[in-house]
Amino acid sequence: MIKLHRQSYKNLQNISTASPSRVCKSARGKTSTAQKSHVNKGALSCDVHPHQAQELVSQQVELLHVLHRNDEMWRLAVQDTTKHIQSAEKKASRFSRRKQTAPPKTKSLRTPPACSTDKQNAPTVPASPSSYETLGCREQRPENPKDEATLPLTAHNIPKKAPSLLEKIGLKLKRTVEYIGASNCAFEDD
């Protein structure tokens, strides 16, 4: 069972996960508990401003930028990973000093699990908040209502060549509703 601890500070959330010790069975049939516990630490930033998360970057945690809207969550690309890459290069150089025949291995960066099950990657989310007005962490709406797509529901302003959406729906309903008739084959002669 994995435990998830969360701490909040303004618009940042610290998340750390810890998996409990595992129970192993030896060859003799005795059960022994392994004293290994795995701990991941991470930080979630609720908006796209990277300068607000500088306090957590100085610590040894991985930083995730996450956009929340209702119950959905989008993970954004990590922008500042220089400390993690430098620490991975140092570990690789130490390993290559010990064994000079083997090539240095690059360590892959792991990300902590997100706290929502509806996790989606969003590579096309804009990095600057210029087009959206942020209301807390959960809601985002366009600044200009003209930017939203509109579809006319009535045909007052549209020429008669193009039927409106309601007319299309009405035409489809009229086409599908037909009287087939009823027959009872039990009383007919063969």
UniProtKB/Swiss-Prot annotation:
GO CC annotations? Answer: nucleus; plasma membrane
* Main localization (coarse): membrane
Q: What is the lineage of its organism?
A: Eukaryota, Metazoa, Chordata, Craniata, Vertebrata
| Keywords per UniProt | Cell membrane, Membrane, Neurogenesis, Nucleus
State its location(s): Cell membrane; Nucleus
This protein's source sits in the domain of life called: Eukaryota
Return the annotated region ranges for Disordered: 88-156
Extent of Polar residues compositional bias: 117-133
The disruption phenotype is:
Morpholino knockdown of the protein causes inhibition of primary neurogenesis.
Biased composition regions of type Basic and acidic residues, renumbered to the chain: 136-149
Q: In its UniProt entry, what is this protein called? A: Vexin
